[in-house]
A protein has these predicted regions:
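Membrane-interface extramembranous regions
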Residues: 1-147
Length: 147
């Protein structure tokens, strides 16, 4: 196997694993871990925490299944998933700042370490779907004053 083939397989496996993880997390939003997810909704969000948890769970299931099955649209799905991970990051920051215990994150150190993993999820979504190429193309096609 050459390098390109290995890279394609690695991306495929990473994309499917991320899709399965998102689907599983989304299902847990709707059931077993619902109360813990509600505790993570920042107090400044102007919506009912239960609605936020249910809606984000449905979105995670859709994104997870899309990562697995919509391979022809994988780059666009990857961009959306990365944007979703960025959008939920304030909830993780709120959990850290307010010292909210959930999912075994019961110390500031554990919550702080979790914050470091969120950018990795963004990178995972972009790399495994090859969405970087969309970003590069968009960046190159724009006229930049600093060129």
């Amino acid at each position: 196997m050459n390098r390109a083939t290995i890279s394609r397989w690695a991306r495929l496996i990473a994309r499917v694993l991320l899709g399965l993880a998102l689907t599983s997390a989304g299902i847990s939003h709707l059931g077993s871990a619902r109360a813990e997810f509600q505790a993570q909704v920042p107090p400044w969000v102007p919506l009912d925490p239960d609605f936020v948890v249910l809606a984000s769970g449905v979105v995670e299931i859709i994104f997870g299944l899309s990562l697995v099955f919509l391979w022809r649209r994988k780059m666009w799905v990857g961009l959306l998933v990365a944007a979703f991970f960025v959008a939920i990051f304030p909830g993780n920051i709120s959990q850290f700042i307010n010292g909210i215990d959930a999912f075994g994150l019961d110390t500031d150190e554990a919550r702080g370490i979790r914050l470091l993993f969120q950018p990795l999820l963004v990178l995972w979504a972009l790399w495994s779907t090859s969405a970087w190429s969309l970003i590069r193309t968009a960046w190159r096609s724009r006229s930049h004053p600093i060129r």
